[in-house]
Amino acid sequence: MKFGSLLGLSLVGLSVASPVTNVWKSPRAADDFIRGVNLGGWLVLEPWITPGIFEEGGDSAVDEWTLSAALGHRAHERLKLHWNTFMEQKDFDRIKGAGLTHVRIPIGYWAVAPIQGEPFVQGQVDMLDAAIDWARHSGLKVNVDLHGAPGSQNGFDNSGRLGPANWQKGDTVAQTYKALDVLIQRYAKKDGVVDEINLINEPFPQAGIQVEPLKDYYRQGAAKVKSANPNVAVVISDAFMGPSKWNGFDVGAKTIIDTHHYQVFSPQLVAMDINQHVKAACDFGNDELAKSSIPAIVGEWCGALTDCTQYLNGRHEGARYDGTHKDSDPKTAVPNGCVRKTGGSASQLTDEEKTNTRRYIEAQLDSFSKGHGWFWWTWKTERGSPGWDLNDLLSNGLFPQPLDSRMFLGQCN
């Protein structure tokens, strides 16, 4: 969960839509349209989602690797407590009750194919097994997402290890196939529940990942999934290039391309006003999703208009919005702008902030109808995170219920 799409970010404003309660009709109302949510921070840990666990590990704990090392012999017991309590059947029931169809469950290679000498602990697959049972009981389908690869495919903390992207070096790709093989053998034949297997999350060419070897990995990974169960979709990442850049790429299997859309991970993005955020969201659907020859899903997105959530940019990083991040632009930063926004509930937002959040969410829902579906990031957080915590947004009426209800109709027309 980093960077996201920087496409279509024209700074031309829109007029504000008049608030009306109405029903919006998707141009793609097919039964296979995905409306899902990520279970982030559960089986792959992230500091901003569960800050308390990382704080227990001290200042050195900035990702799951360093957290596990810092906790030492206590790591397995502490993480097992988290795995066993963070998500339950009642969460899946509430997700289904909100009109969603899928959950995307991130998991790291270390959970299924640990490498000797690394500090990670295991036990996550027991809860992934439980999650599939919960999904079956609730009537949800599952996207199993290989979120962290050996060496790190992007250098982000959510890959398991913050730092250089060393995937594709040494034996890391071969080690990734071992992890993928376990996931496929264990889950690809869960017909009716496991709907997709995501081969790798957010490989990042700008960090040194080579695209041609990535394509080879996609082809071989897709062949493995297809051999196990041709009905399970293979999900490939657009690698921050935009889905239309992959037009014509064929892995020889039922394929979905995954793109992520965030508008908070640069000074230019957090400086935009609500009209510009809405326009950027609408442009993304028209410029990328509608032009993709491969069925495209927005595998991660949110309603955040700032990067203020504590640790969102990293364990010891500030925010661009208020000027406390090293990459901030002092010309556009808002001093003290993150007051009331670092955590807690969306209920504490001002009326204007609530309206803007709802409007931005609706625009994205409308825009993403140009694709094959979406997965919101993320279902819940430990301390709350306005704009990210879907469970909280639902409770505060900032996420449409039912999903096709609109207060701001026709924003992307």
From Swiss-Prot:
The keyword Disulfide bond applies. SUPFAM superfamilies: (Trans)glycosidases. Its EC number is 2.4.1.-, 3.2.1.58. Keywords: Cell adhesion, Cell wall, Cell wall biogenesis/degradation, Disulfide bond, Glycosidase, Hydrolase, Secreted, Signal, Transferase. Residues 1-17 form the signal peptide. The active site is at residues 202, 300. Monomer. This is Probable glucan 1,3-beta-glucosidase ARB_04467. It comes from Arthroderma benhamiae (strain ATCC MYA-4681 / CBS 112371).
